[in-house]
Amino acid sequence: MKKIFPFLLAAIVLSACQSKPVVGETVAIEDGSYRNVSAQELNTMMKEKDFVFINVHTPFAGLITDTDLSIPYDEIGVPENLSQLPIDKNAKIVLYCRSGRMSEIAASELVSLGYTNIWNLAGGMVAWEQAGYGIEK
């Protein structure tokens, strides 16, 4: 048993490092928080769209229908891109990318800039397609 314990501990630590975003979870970060949303929940939200919908993936890998803007995740805080965003920092903004990682980074950046109603599509376009919804290529 003593020989197995270090391997078991290592397996637990490694599996924790590969965690995926929890859908519906509010993600607390240094300057505030953003919320992860599932593909199914986003599809429901799209029926009464009351948000700015932004693809932050780079390079281009497709779009979800009704996307409002495409801004590279690492350029979302640049003044010419900020000028495309709502002036109201409480406006709802939903971000997505291919897998969810770039949109998490962009969500954190927008929260650090004072935006308070940021949503992230957990799993990105991959999750969207896996849920049976289409992508415009």
Language-model features, listed with the residues they occupy:
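Short, surface-exposed ligand- or partner-binding patches at beta-edge/loop junctions that are enriched
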Residues: 96
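Rhodanese-like catalytic fold shared by cysteine-dependent sulfurtransferases
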Residues: 2-6, 17-51, 59-92, 101-137
